[in-house]
């Protein structure tokens, strides 16, 4: 019979009044955001069903020989593929449902894009953890039922976090807690039989894994997604609100970048390095857009130096969105990112580019170099506005020559109108963007304002004397940057601290069952000394002392004395406890460290219903192939939702299943993985 230990007095995990910390939003609350998440969960289930049906039809098509059966299967397969395409479009519609996440204040501003939270299935830790506690730690598992329940409640709360800092802390606390759990219950030499399932945020396809890699990466993704939702709900009509938005998007970029650099073999395409790089760019672009809105919020004065600054700020935002759109257009991101997101990036790139040209035209047409003006400063600002001046023009000559200024200004207006028309065209082409009325209103208002300015200064020979205005150089007074996550601000106590100090009592170390040492505590000399922090070890053991004769060994860890848990007691505390039993016989329970079986770290099998290979499997196969043969041809990675059939398609399972221990399969091929009012002649543009 395995000896068991009495638990130490449980320490409070949190201070009183912090009960909210483990709670998420009410999952039954019918808010706009919860409705969207419920729709996402329902779509995920429909996609799972459709993918399984497609997989079954493809398998039947491979083995069927009857021509009529094959024709019928092909017909059914075409219906299933059509359904999958429709479901994908519905999921894309949820990803572009930006109105729900915006602030409640009425604002004439372009909506920002948030990320939706990844959905997951429930996981029951109780049986697996209780078995492991009994087997590995030799303790009564029923003593930890409340702790396991707390962990499961925390995970459940993380599925519906509140859209504020408390929600972020909730997710961070679970992420930190997962680090404790991984060390306590997940040995590096075997799997625990728990299957963690998360749904891809963009495709809805479920991916399952038996290690905590997927769980931790998905929680990090949701922390970043929650920051984006916090950023989009900020009041962008106040300086404080815009500052909060900038901070939130920078933090979102930091979390996503941390995810990309820390979890390189994530098994889902929405968390692949290529996709995460694009998402980081998108968050920084939206942060830069908020910086521009913050500059414009007090009103743009019709003054030379102010207009130079605003024009370059707008050009900076346009540059950020151009780079974002270029990244979204690359493979393999292009296959899985919502098309409407790429359209938004394209629209904003041209919209803010048009604003840069409009403000440049305004400063050239409306302002003259007056006597007594700071000529040198204006010349310097104008020269810094462009990479190069148009042929035959110099900054100082242009400032002094009214005709040249107006001519160059008209060139900027001409380019601004072209950019406005291109942004409106793209917004009208995308069905999802046509439904966002505020976006169309902002684009139309900016276009009309530029056209009015052009009409006020139009002449008959404009087409003959038109100058091709150069691009406005991007420049900003505040360069947005990644804000890395600070997990130290969240204080978390290990749910399973009763098992003992984590540095000693972990899943990576094997222990003997607790042995009872019955000996008499002699006055003065115990026959051994103690060393270490917590728990303490037996040291310098006299082979003739009563403890040694009772079975104690040098190096043993003392875990209890007379039923008192000693795993967290220091040397002085244990010594004081022993001496309190002077002259009496005591029972001291000890454990010995066993040699760990040498074994390579198991690579975790990843399961994705109906998928050829997940991202992590591709990366793992690459690692293996590099060792075997570095000259193998790299084949193109297939899309996560490739609707058609392929001759070289690998066989896929229609159901999720647990892997067999020790089963290894060789890989034969290597895969790579603002409001704008019309400009008057007054000193203010707004």
Curated annotation (Swiss-Prot):
Residues in BRO1 domain copies: 111-502
Location of the region described as Interaction with Rho in the Swiss-Prot/TrEMBL record: 46-66
Stretches that traverse the bilayer: none
Keyword Phosphoprotein in record: yes
Main location per the UniProt record: cytoplasm
Gene Ontology annotations for the cellular component aspect, listed alphabetically: perinuclear region of cytoplasm; plasma membrane
Top-level taxon of the source organism: Eukaryota
Function: Binds specifically to GTP-Rho. May function in a Rho pathway to limit stress fiber formation and/or increase the turnover of F-actin structures in the absence of high levels of RhoA activity.
Protein's UniProt name: Rhophilin-2
Source organism (scientific name): Mus musculus (Mouse)
């Amino acid at each position: 019979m395995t000896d068991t230990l009495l638990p130490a007095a449980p320490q409070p995990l949190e201070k009183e009044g912090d009960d909210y910390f483990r709670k998420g939003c009410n999952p039954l609350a019918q808010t706009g955001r919860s409705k969207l998440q419920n729709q996402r969960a329902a779509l995920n289930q429909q996609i799972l069903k459709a993918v399984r049906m497609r997989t079954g039809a493809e398998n039947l098509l491979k083995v069927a020989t009857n021509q009529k059966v094959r024709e019928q299967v092909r017909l059914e397969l075409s219906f299933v593929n059509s359904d999958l395409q429709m479901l994908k479009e519905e999921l894309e519609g949820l990803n572009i449902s930006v109105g729900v996440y915006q602030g409640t204040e009425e604002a004439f501003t372009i909506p920002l894009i948030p990320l939706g939270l990844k959905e997951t299935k429930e996981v029951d830790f109780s049986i697996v953890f209780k078995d492991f506690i009994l087997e590995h730690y030799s303790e009564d598992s029923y003593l930890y039922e409340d702790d396991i329940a707390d962990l499961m409640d925390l995970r459940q709360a993380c599925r519906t976090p509140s859209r504020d800092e408390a929600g972020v802390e909730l997710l961070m606390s679970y992420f930190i807690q997962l680090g404790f759990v991984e060390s306590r219950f997940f040995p590096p030499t075997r799997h625990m039989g728990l299957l963690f399932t998360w749904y891809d945020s963009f495709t809805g396809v479920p991916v399952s894994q038996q290690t905590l890699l997927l769980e931790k990466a998905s929680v990090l993704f949701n922390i970043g997604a929650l920051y984006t939702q916090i950023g989009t709900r900020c009041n962008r009509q106040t300086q404080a609100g815009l500052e909060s938005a900038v901070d939130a998007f920078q933090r979102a970029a930091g979390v996503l970048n941390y995810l990309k650099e820390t979890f390189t073999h994530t098994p889902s395409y929405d968390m692949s390095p290529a996709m995460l790089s694009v998402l980081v760019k998108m968050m920084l672009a939206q942060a830069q857009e908020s910086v521009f809105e913050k500059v414009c919020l007090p009103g743009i004065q019709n003054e030379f130096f102010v207009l130079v600054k605003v024009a370059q700020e707008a050009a900076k935002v346009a540059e950020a969105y151009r780079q974002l759109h270029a990244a979204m257009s690359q493979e393999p991101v292009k296959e899985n990112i919502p098309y409407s997101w790429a359209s938004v990036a394209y629209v904003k790139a041209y919209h803010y580019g048009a604003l840069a040209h409009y403000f440049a035209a305004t400063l050239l047409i409306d302002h003259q170099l007056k006597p007594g003006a700071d000529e040198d400063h204006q010349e310097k600002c104008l020269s810094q506005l462009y990479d190069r001046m148009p042929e035959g023009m110099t900054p100082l000559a242009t400032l002094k020559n009214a005709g040249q200024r107006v001519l160059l200004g008209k060139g900027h207006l001409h380019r601004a109108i072209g950019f406005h028309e291109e942004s409106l065209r793209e917004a009208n082409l995308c069905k999802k963007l046509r439904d966002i009325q505020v976006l169309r209103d902002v684009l139309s208002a900016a276009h009309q304002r530029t056209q009015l300015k052009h009409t006020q200064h139009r002449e008959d020979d404009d087409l003959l004397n038109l100058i091709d205005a150069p691009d406005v150089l991007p420049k900003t007074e505040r360069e947005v940057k990644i804000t890395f996550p600070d997990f130290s601000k969240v204080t978390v106590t290990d749910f399973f601290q009763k098992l003992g100090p984590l540095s000693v009592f972990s899943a990576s170390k094997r222990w003997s069952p607790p042995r009872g040492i019955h000996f008499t505590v002699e006055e003065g000399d115990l026959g051994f000394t103690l060393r270490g922090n917590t728990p303490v070890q037996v040291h310098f053991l006299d082979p003739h002392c009563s403890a040694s004769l009772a079975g104690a060994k040098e190096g043993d860890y003392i875990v209890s004395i007379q039923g008192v848990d000693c795993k967290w007691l220091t040397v002085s505390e244990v010594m004081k406890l022993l001496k309190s039993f002077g002259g009496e016989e005591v029972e001291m329970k000890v454990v010995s460290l066993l040699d760990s079986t040498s074994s390579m770290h198991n690579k975790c099998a990843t399961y994705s219903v109906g998928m050829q290979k997940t991202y992590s499997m591709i990366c793992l196969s690459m690692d293996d192939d590099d060792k075997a043969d570095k000259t193998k041809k790299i084949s193109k990675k297939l899309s996560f939702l490739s609707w058609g059939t392929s001759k070289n398609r690998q066989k896929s399972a229609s159901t999720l299943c647990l892997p067999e221990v020790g089963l290894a399969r060789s890989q034969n091929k290597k895969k790579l993985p603002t409001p704008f009012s019309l400009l008057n002649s007054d000193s203010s543009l707004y």
